[in-house]
Amino acid sequence: MEELQLQGYLEKDGFRQQNFLYPLIFQEYIYTLAHDHGLNSSIFYEPMEIVGLGYDNKSSSVLVKRLITRMYQQNSLIYSMNDFNQNRFVGHNNSFYSNFYSKMVSEGFAVIVEIPFSLRLVPSSEEIPKSQNLRSIHSIFPFLEDKLSHLNYVLDILIPYPIHLEILVKILQCWIQDVPSLHFLRFFLHEFHNWNNLITPTKSISVFSKENKRLFRILYNSYVSEYEFVFVFLRKQSYYLRSTSSGAFLERTHFYVKIEHLIDVCHNHFQKILWFFKDSFMHYVRYKGKAILASRGTYLLIKKWKCYLVNFWQYNLNFWSKPYRIHINPFSNYSFYFLGYISSVLINPSAVKNQMLENFYLVDTLTQKFDTIVPVIPLIGSLSKAKFCTILGHPISKPIWAELSDSDIIDRFGRICRNLSHYHSGSSKKQSLYRIKYILRLSCARTLARKHKSTVRNLLQRLGSGLLEEFFTEEEQVISPIFQKTTLFPLHGSHRERIWYLDITRINDLANYLDWS
C-alpha cells in the first residue's frame, strides 16, 4: 500500500533528460526566442537602445553573433574554472558589454533550461492520462474567502533565500543530465559575480533577481519546486513520519534506496506513535516569495509546524532559515499581506431577536468574515518606481513613452489601469482605486502634453475632454470561461461589490509591489 502511495512522488525523480542541451547555447535562434519573449513579457517593456554604438533592438543580432564567436573561441574555459579570472569570454572591459552579454547569456540559457520542463507537459501517446493535483491563482481567491474564516492560526512565511549557487546546480542536476550544460551554468554564475564584484563569502542567487530576471525565475522556481516536492511528500506521510525525518532527504542521490528503506521504517515503527502530528485542516498557499500555512489546530500544533519548517530547510537544503521569517498569528487580530491585498478575518458581532411564547430575548452571535483591502501606499510606491508619479503620489509624465503615437500612449496607460482594477475586483472597499486611477489619468495627460509641447489644459481644450474617456468607461465585455463580466469599475457604480474574476492569466507587474526581503 505504501508503495502505491509513493509512486507519484517517484515519478519526478525517475524523470531523466538524456538530450544534450549544451549545443543550443551556440544557436542564434535561441537568443531570438529570448528577445521575442522579452518584447511580450511586460507592458512596461521599453525598447533597448545601445547608446553610442549605433545598434537598436532589431539589429542586436550582430552582437549575438559576436557573443557566440567569442564563446566558441574560449570554449575551454567552461571546463577550466581556474582561469576565468584572467580570461573572460566577453572579451571587453567595457561595462556595457559585460552587462549586455551577461543578460543575453542568461536569457538564452533560461530558454534552454526550460526545455526539459516543457517536455514533461507534452503527453506521450502511450501514457495514460492522469489528473494533476495542481492549484492555480484561479482557485486561490475563493479559497481565501471560503476557508480562512474557519481557521484559527496562520504561519506568515517568507520563503528563505538567497540559496548557495552550488545547491542550485545540484537541484538542476536532478532534471538535466547534460553535464556540459551544468558546467556552463556554474561557470556563468561565478563569472557574473566577478563582473559585478559581488563575490562574497556566501554566494547567493539574490544578485540575479533584478538584472537577469528570467534566469532568476528558473533557478528560484527549481529551488521552490524541490523543497515543495519533499515537503508535500512528508506532509502526506505525516501520519508515519517524525518532523525531524527530513534529514533522510539531505540529497537526492540514491533517492530510490532511501525511499525503499523509509517505507519499512514508516510501516514498522511510526504507524502508531506520531498520530498527534497529523493535521487534517492544514492549508498551504504560495505566491512568489511568500506563503501562508493556515491551520484549524491549536497554538501548540502550529508552533510544531514552524519548528518543522526551520528544520526542514536546514537539513534538506543546507539552508539556515531565520525563525523570525515565519510568524505565528491568530486570524482574529492579525492582518497579513498576500496576493496584493491586505487580508484579515473580521469578527462581526450581531444580535438576534428570538421569541419564545410571550418572552423576547436577544442572542449575541459572532460571525467571521474574510476581508481584503487594497494597499494604496505600496501601489503608489510601485507607480513611483515606474516613473508615473513622485513618491508622494503627484503624477508626472512618462518621457520614454513620449515618442509613441497618441493611441499607443493611451492604450498603455489604459491597460495598466484595467489590469489593476481587474485584479483588485474582489476587494470589499474600492474607493482607494480612484486615487490610483487619477494618477494614471493625469500622468497620461502630461505625457501627451510633453509630446505635443503643450500644457495639460491646452491639450484637453484642443483635443476635447473625451480624450481620456477610456479611464472612466466600463471595461469591455470579455468572454470568460467562468461567467460573463458586467461593469467592472464604473465611475458611479457600487464600490462595495465583491466579485472574484477567475479568468486572470497573468498578474500585472504593478501587483508585485513588495520586495522579497
From Swiss-Prot:
<dbReference type="Pfam" id="PF01824">
    <property type="entry name" value="MatK_N"/>
</dbReference>
<dbReference type="GO" id="GO:0008033">
    <property type="term" value="P:tRNA processing"/>
</dbReference>
<dbReference type="GO" id="GO:0009507">
    <property type="term" value="C:chloroplast"/>
</dbReference>
<keyword id="KW-0694">RNA-binding</keyword>
<dbReference type="GO" id="GO:0008380">
    <property type="term" value="P:RNA splicing"/>
</dbReference>
<protein>
    <recommendedName>
        <fullName>Maturase K</fullName>
    </recommendedName>
</protein>
<dbReference type="InterPro" id="IPR024942">
    <property type="entry name" value="Maturase_MatK_N"/>
</dbReference>
<dbReference type="InterPro" id="IPR024937">
    <property type="entry name" value="Domain_X"/>
</dbReference>
<comment type="similarity">
    <text>Belongs to the intron maturase 2 family. MatK subfamily.</text>
</comment>
<dbReference type="GO" id="GO:0003723">
    <property type="term" value="F:RNA binding"/>
</dbReference>
<keyword id="KW-0934">Plastid</keyword>
<dbReference type="InterPro" id="IPR002866">
    <property type="entry name" value="Maturase_MatK"/>
</dbReference>
<keyword id="KW-0819">tRNA processing</keyword>
<keyword id="KW-0507">mRNA processing</keyword>
<keyword id="KW-0150">Chloroplast</keyword>
<dbReference type="GO" id="GO:0006397">
    <property type="term" value="P:mRNA processing"/>
</dbReference>
<comment type="function">
    <text>Usually encoded in the trnK tRNA gene intron. Probably assists in splicing its own and other chloroplast group II introns.</text>
</comment>
<dbReference type="Pfam" id="PF01348">
    <property type="entry name" value="Intron_maturas2"/>
</dbReference>
